[in-house]
Amino acid sequence: MEPRFDEETTQELLDRLARIEGQVRGISKMVQERRPCDQVLTQVMAARAALEKVGAAVVTHNIDECLALPPEQARKVLVRSVQLLTKA
């Protein structure tokens, strides 16, 4: 069985994603307003960094959950996670 998110982790991730969603809406508005490229790019990079932190939180949770699995099952889950991470 693949690791799943508990209530607390789910809420933390959803909160982070909602903030990122707001950042992206703000970037869209900046583009519509024809704001300077450096200002837009700064916000794009901030949103990207926030999204990368969400990914890191997911990976950390996955590893923590795998530690509680039987070794062979944990290995399969971790191998799959590495495949997904290196695919990008």
Please give the residue ranges for each predicted region.
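Solvent-exposed interaction patches of small proteins and small membrane subunits
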Residues: M1-A88
